[in-house]
Amino acid sequence: MSQGDDDKIPENVLLASLDDMINWGRANSLWPMFFGLSCCFVEMMTSFTSRYDVSRFGAEVLRGTPRESDLMVIAGTVFKKMAPSILRLYDQMAEPKWVISMGSCANSGGMYDVYSVVQGVNQILPVDLYIPGCPPRPESFLEGLMLLQQKIRSEERPTRPVLRMQGGTQGTVAPILVDGATKSRDTRGPGMEGIAIRGSAMQPPYFAAPRSDELWRPKQPRLPYPDFNLQAELQGAFAGQVVLDETACDMLTYRAPARLVPELLRHLKERKESPFRRLEDIACVDESCRRDREKYKDFTVNYHLTCFDTPGRIRIKTELEGSYPEAPSITSVFPVANWYEREAYDMFGIRFAGHPNLRRILMPPDWDGHPLRKEHPARATELPPYTAEDARRQKALPAGDFFDRVDDETLILNLGPQHPGTHGVIRFVLKLSGEEIVDMDSDIGYHHRAAEKTGERQNWHQYIPYTDRVDYLSGVQNNLAYLNSVETLCGIEIPDRAIYIRVMLCELFRIANHLVWLGTFASDLGAMTPVFYTFTDREKIFDIVEFITGGRMHPAWFRIGGVAEDLPEGWQEKVHSFLEWFPGRLAEYEKLLSGNPIFVARLKGVSAITVDTALEWGITGPNLRACDFAWDLRKKMPYGGYDRFEFEVATAQGGDCYARYQVRMEEMRQSLSIVRQAAAGMPGGRFISPDYRYTLPQKRDALEDIESLIHHFVNSTRGISPPKGECYAPIEGSKGEYGYFAVSDGLHTAYRMRIRTATFPHIQSLPVLSRGWLVSDFLAILGSLDFVLSDLDR
C-alpha cells in the first residue's frame, strides 16, 4: 500500500505486522507454571488474589505441568539440591519460554551467601527479567509481569521461527552467566574482589585478641527450674555415672557417658512420677574452636526432653571424642530421634550405632563434608562456582532405594520435589497397594539455606532478619523465638510496653499464618472459594504490620531488649478496625466449611492418632492439641508476658484431620481476644530495655548521653557479647513449639545456633499418619499438619 492510501482503509480493519500480532497474543496470554521455591512465592501468589488481581494482565492461569507452561517465575532461593529439578522443569517447558527471577535470593543469592545456595539463578538458567526485593511486594511482581510483556512486544521477532524459517527471535535469549567470569564472584558487588570479608573466631579471617574479654559482664543468670527429685534417683539407678551439671542455668542438666544415654533416657521416659514423655531435640556442638579448648571433648550431644506432669525440661549431655565419633542410637526409646540422628550424621559426621537407616537427610547424597563442622566453609563464595553442568551431574536418590526391595506387586509413586499440593520443594515417595498407602518416606533438604551456620557468622543483632525467614509465614514470631533464648541468656528485663507490643504483633501473625493455612488447605481439598477471602483478611493484617513496622512478611522489627521503634500514631484505629471486622469473617469461614458435607467427609476420622503416638513422634502445637491434650507453652510455661493475658487453650477430640482444623479455627478466635487485650491495655513507657550492654539505645538517648552513644557505636558495629553459656527457651509458634538453642563463648557471634522447629518432627511422622489411607487422602493429611519448607529444612 502506498503512502496516502490510509484514508481508503475501512474503520473496522487494523493493519499490523505478523510479528506484532504474534507478540500481542503471547504477551497477553502468558502461562506461568505453578512453581515456587521460597518466601517470594507467597507474595507472588498474593498477586493472584482479589486485592491485586493478576488476571487483569492475562497471566492468571497457573499450569500444573511444565509442558503446559511458557513462563517460569523463579520465586525465591535457588538451592543446590533443587537446581537439577529446576533445570529439568525448564527443559520440559514449551517453546518459546521466558524466565523471571523474583527476589534477591533468586537474583544473586541475596543475604544467603551460604554453601547450599546457588548465587543467582542466572548461573543455571537464562533470565529475561529481575525483580528486586526480599521478598518483592505483589505490586512489584505485577510490574515485572508488565515489563516482560513490554519486552515481548517490543524486542521479539517471532514470525520466522513460527513459519519454520531461519532467523528471528523469540523467548529468552539472555546468556547463562558464569560466576567469577561474566558475573561478580563477590556478593558485595564488583570492585570488592581481594578485600577480606570480616570473620569471627570460627570463620576466617581471624581477628586477634578480641576486646570482648576486656569488658566486664555478669555471668549468665540462673533460672528457677524444677529438679523433679531426680538426683538421688539417678544416683541409685546409675551408680554415680550420671552427674548433675551445676553450671547449667536455663534448665536441669545432667552429664552421662554415651553408652548410658539410651538406658538413661528410657528411665526418664518411663519413671512413674513426672515422666519425660517427649524428646524435643538433639542438638550437637562441634567444640573444636572453643577458646578454652582444654575443657571440652571434640563434640557434645545435647538431648532435650519435656515433662508434662510437672511442666519443665531436662537436658542430657554426652561428650564424644574423635574426628568421626560414634554414639548409640536412641531410636528404640524415642522413634522421633530417627531424623535428629540422621541430621547429626549429615551435618557433623557423628555416627549412631543401631540406627535403622543412617544416611544424609538435608544435603545431597554426594555432598562432600559435613556443613556444621567448624572447618566446613560457610559461604558459597568460598566454594567452587556452581554451574548448570554441576546441576546436571547431580542425581537424586532413586525412589526404589527408599524401601526394601520386595516382589509384592506394590507401586512406587514419586510426589515432588515440585508438586502444587506440597506447597514448596519437598519429595514424598509413596509405596502403594492399589491406591492404599502401605508405606512412605520423605526426601527433604530442598529448602536448606544454612540458617544455623549463618547464626555462627552474623553477630547477635545481625542475625534477627535471618530468623524471619525460618517460618516465613509467622513474621515476628520468629524474632521472639530467637530473642527469648538470647534475652534469657543475657538476663535482660523487657519493658512492659515492649512486652505488649510483641504479644499483639505475634498474635496478629498467628492469625495471618492460620489464614494462609485455611485458604490453601481448603483449596487442596477442592474448595477454591476460601483462599481468595482468607488472603484478603491477611492483607488487612499486613496493613497493620506495615503501618507499625514498615515491613510485610519479614518485618525483622523485634530487637534484643524490646522493639525497633515505638508504635506510630494512629495504630489503635487500624487494630480496632480489624478487631471489628474479623469475627464476622471467621464465623462465615466456619459456616462455609464446617457445614460442607464434602469438606467434613474428607477430614473426619482420617489420620487419627492418640496422644501417646503424638508424643512419641514429637508432635507439638495445634496438631498435639487436636488429640485433646491441652499443652500450650503460653499457658503451661509462660514466656514473653503471656501470663498477663486471659485466653483458653484450644483443643479438639479425635486427633484426626478435622480436629486439627477445629483447633486452628478456635486459635484464631483466642488470638483475636489476646490482640484486643493487648491493644486495650497497652502501657506507656520505654519500648526497649535501658540495659545498653546488650541493646541498641533509643536514638534520643544516644543523642543526649555520651555513655549511650558509646554503647550504640559498639553494639551496632562489633555487636554485643553475651556471657558464656547456653540457653534453650522455646515459644508456642503458629505451627508448634519453636526454639533456638543459643550457645555463647562470650563473643559477638554465637558459637552454635541450633534451631528446633515444629515442622521437622511433624513431617517425620507422616508414615504413621498416612499408612492405610488412600492417595487421595494424602494431601488432606499433609495439609492438616500446617507446614512450611523453610521451617523444615532451615
From Swiss-Prot:
Residues 414-794 are annotated as: NADH dehydrogenase I subunit D. Pfam families: Complex1_30kDa, Complex1_49kDa, Oxidored_q6. Residues 1-158 are annotated as: NADH dehydrogenase I subunit B. Residues 232-387 are annotated as: NADH dehydrogenase I subunit C. It catalyses: a quinone + NADH + 5 H(+)(in) = a quinol + NAD(+) + 4 H(+)(out). NDH-1 is composed of about 13 different subunits. Subunits NuoBCD, E, F, and G constitute the peripheral sector of the complex. NCBIfam families: nuoB_fam, NuoD, PRK06075.1, PRK06411.1, PRK13292.1. This is NADH-quinone oxidoreductase subunit B/C/D. The gene is nuoBCD.
